[in-house]
C-alpha cells in the first residue's frame, strides 16, 4: 500500500476489498495520505463507492490540507456521498470556486446526494443559462456526473445549444442519466456527423429503450445513406433480440449498399433464421447469384475496352460486395460462427486457409446450393464459372456497346451508387442522348456523387433544361453538388471562345 507504483497499490486494494478484509476501512484511510495524486483520488473514490462513513473525518482532514485541485474536487464528491450533517456547510462555499475541478466536486457532492439543495440548484441553473460557453460546458458535464433524471430539463436545454461541443457533452451526459424523454432529441441529431460518436455511446447506454426511436429515424425519408448506416451501427452496438428483429425489417431496403451493411451487421450479431424463414434467404441467395453471374458476363464483354475501363472497374467493386453478401446470406442459414470464419478465409493468400474454407462450404452446403455457390468461389476463370452456371443462369455474349445499353436498361436500378455514377459518366463521355430521362431522374438520387455526375453529363450533352437544373442544384444539400453546379453554371455563362 506504500508502493510508489500506483498499479501495485490498486492491486492491493482490490485484493483487500475482494476478501472483505476486516481492516479495509483503516487501510484505505492510510492510502488517503499517499504521496501520489492518482492514488489519493483512487482511495477517495473507493470511500465514496463503499460509503465508508467511518472515514468522514479522514476525508475532512484531506479537504483541509489538500493542495491538488483534482484530489480536492474528488474529496468534495466523496464527502457528499457520505451524507454527513454538515455537508452543505462544508461544500456550499465552493460552488463558485474559480477552479473547474473544485467547483465540479462541490456541485456533484451536493446535488447527487441532496438534489434539493437550493444554492446548488440555483448555481446549476446559472451555469446552464450562462452566456459563457465554458460555463455551459461545465453544466453539461456536471449533469452527467450528478446522474439524476430530476435535472433532465436542463439537459434538454443544453441539447439545443448552438455550440456543438456543449451538445456533444450533453448527449454523453444523457446517456448516463438515461431519461427516455431525451431520446427523440438525441436521435434527431444523427445527421450532425460530429455528434455521431457521442450519440452511439448514449444510445448504447439506453439500450433497447432507444430502438423504437432509432427505427422511426431510420425510416425517415430525409436521412441519407451515411446516417442510416450510423443507425445500423448503433443497433448492432445495442444488440439483443429486439435489435436483430429491427435489422431484419431492413433486409429488403432499396439501397444496395445499405442492404449489404444490414446483412453484415446481422451476421456479426450471429443472426440465425428460423427454420420456417430460411427459404427467404435461400431465395435472396439465388437472386444474388443471378446478379453476380450477370456481372461476370458484363465484365467479360467490357474487358480490355479502354473506353469502358471506369465502368468495368465499378462492376468489379460491386461484384466483390455482392459476393460477400452471398456469404453473409449463407451465414443466416448455416452456423453463423463457422460461416464468418469461412468468410474471413475464403480470399486468404494462404493457400491452406483458402482450401479449408472451401472444404467447409463443400461439407456444409446442400447439393443445390453447392452448384451455384462454389463456382463463384473456387479458383476458376470467368468462362469456366459461366459455363458451370449456364443451366441455372444463362448469359449471352454481347458487344461492349450492346452490353452497356443493357446495363443502363436492366442494371442501373439495382446497381451500387458508384456503379450508377460511372454509368452516368459514360453517358456524358459518349455524348449519348438516348437516356436523357435517366439523367434527369438521377438528379433526385440520394447519393451526391450520382447527382453531380448527372449534372456533368447533362452539361456535356448540352441538354436544353441544363440551366434550370443547375439553378436548382446550386442550393443542393450537398456541398460537392453545389460546387459542381456553380462551376457548370459559370462555364455555360462564359462567352464562347472565338478562336
What are these regions (language model features)?
Residues 4-5, 35-37, 67-68, 98-100, ...:
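Short inter-helical turns and helix N-cap capping residues of alpha-solenoid HEAT/ARM repeat scaffolds
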Residues 8-20, 30, 40-52, 61, ...:
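Structural detector for internal amphipathic alpha-helices that build alpha-solenoid repeat scaffolds
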Residues 1, 21-33, 52-64, 84-96, ...:
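Amphipathic alpha-helical scaffolding segments comprising HEAT/armadillo-like alpha-solenoid repeats
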Residues 274-275, 382-383, 481:
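Non-catalytic terminal/accessory segments
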Residues 285-294, 383:
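Amphipathic alpha-helical segments within extended alpha-helical solenoids and repeat-rich scaffolds
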Residues 24, 360, 368-377, 382-394:
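Redox- and metal-dependent alpha/beta enzyme cores, enriched for Fe-S-associated oxidoreductases
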Residues 3, 312-317, 324-343:
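N-terminal transition regions in large eukaryotic proteins
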Residues 1-26, 311-318, 322:
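Non-transmembrane accessory domains of multi-pass membrane transporters/channels
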Amino acid at each position: 500500500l506504500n508502493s510508489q507504483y500506483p498499479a501495485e497499490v490498486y492491486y492491493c486494494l482490490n485484493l483487500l476489498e475482494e476478501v472483505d478484509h476486516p481492516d479495509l476501512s483503516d487501510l484505505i484511510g492510510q492510502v488517503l495520505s499517499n504521496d501520489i495524486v492518482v492514488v489519493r483520488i483512487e482511495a477517495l473514490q473507493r470511500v465514496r463507492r463503499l460509503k465508508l462513513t467511518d472515514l468522514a473525518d479522514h476525508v475532512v482532514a484531506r479537504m483541509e490540507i489538500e493542495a491538488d485541485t483534482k484530489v480536492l474536487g474528488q474529496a468534495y464528491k466523496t464527502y457528499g456521498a457520505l451524507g454527513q450533517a454538515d455537508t452543505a456547510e462544508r461544500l456550499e462555499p465552493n460552488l463558485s470556486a474559480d477552479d473547474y475541478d473544485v467547483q465540479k466536486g462541490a456541485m456533484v457532492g451536493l446535488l447527487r446526494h441532496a438534489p434539493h439543495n437550493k444554492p446548488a440548484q440555483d448555481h446549476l441553473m446559472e451555469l446552464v443559462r450562462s452566456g459563457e460557453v465554458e460555463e455551459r460546458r461545465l453544466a453539461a458535464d456536471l449533469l452527467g456526473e450528478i446522474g439524476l433524471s430530476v435535472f433532465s430539463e436542463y439537459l434538454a436545454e443544453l441539447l439545443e445549444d448552438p455550440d456543438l461541443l456543449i451538445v456533444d457533452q450533453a448527449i454523453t451526459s444523457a446517456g448516463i442519466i438515461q431519461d427516455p424523454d431525451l431520446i427523440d432529441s438525441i436521435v434527431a441529431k444523427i445527421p450532425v456527423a460530429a455528434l455521431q460518436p457521442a450519440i452511439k455511446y448514449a444510445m448504447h447506454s439506453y439500450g433497447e429503450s432507444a430502438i423504437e426511436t432509432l427505427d422511426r429515424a431510420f425510416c425517415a425519408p430525409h436521412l441519407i445513406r451515411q446516417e442510416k448506416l450510423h443507425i445500423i451501427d448503433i443497433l448492432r452496438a445495442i444488440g439483443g433480440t429486439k435489435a436483430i428483429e429491427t435489422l431484419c425489417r431492413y433486409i429488403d431496403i432499396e439501397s444496395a449498399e445499405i442492404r449489404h451493411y444490414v446483412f453484415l451487421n446481422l451476421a456479426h450479431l450471429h443472426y440465425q433464421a428460423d427454420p420456417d424463414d430460411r427459404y427467404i434467404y435461400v431465395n435472396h441467395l439465388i437472386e444474388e447469384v443471378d446478379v453476380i453471374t450477370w456481372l461476370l458476363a458484363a465484365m467479360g464483354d467490357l474487358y480490355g475496352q479502354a473506353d469502358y475501363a471506369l465502368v468495368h472497374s465499378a462492376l468489379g467493386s460491386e461484384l466483390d460486395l455482392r459476393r460477400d453478401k452471398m456469404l453473409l446470406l449463407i451465414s443466416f442459414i448455416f452456423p453463423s460462427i463457422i460461416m464468418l470464419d469461412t468468410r474471413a478465409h475464403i480470399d486468404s493468400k494462404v493457400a491452406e486457409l483458402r482450401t479449408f474454407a472451401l472444404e467447409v462450404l463443400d461439407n456444409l452446403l446442400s447439393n443445390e446450393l453447392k452448384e451455384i455457390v462454389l463456382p463463384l468461389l473456387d479458383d476458376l476463370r470467368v468462362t469456366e464459372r459461366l459455363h458451370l452456371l449456364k443451366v441455372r443462369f444463362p448469359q449471352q455474349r454481347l458487344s461492349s456497346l450492346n452490353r452497356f445499353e443493357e446495363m443502363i436498361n436492366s442494371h442501373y436500378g439495382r446497381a451500387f451508387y458508384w456503379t450508377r455514377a460511372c454509368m452516368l459518366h459514360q453517358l456524358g463521355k459518349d455524348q449519348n442522348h438516348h437516356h436523357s430521362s435517366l439523367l434527369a431522374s438521377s438528379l433526385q438520387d440520394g447519393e451526391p456523387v450520382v447527382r453531380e455526375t448527372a449534372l456533368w453529363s447533362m452539361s456535356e450533352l448540352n441538354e436544353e433544361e441544363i440551366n434550370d437544373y443547375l439553378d436548382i442544384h446550386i442550393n443542393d444539400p450537398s456541398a460537392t453538388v453545389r460546387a459542381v453546379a456553380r462551376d457548370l453554371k459559370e462555364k455555360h455563362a462564359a462567352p464562347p471562345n472565338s478562336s
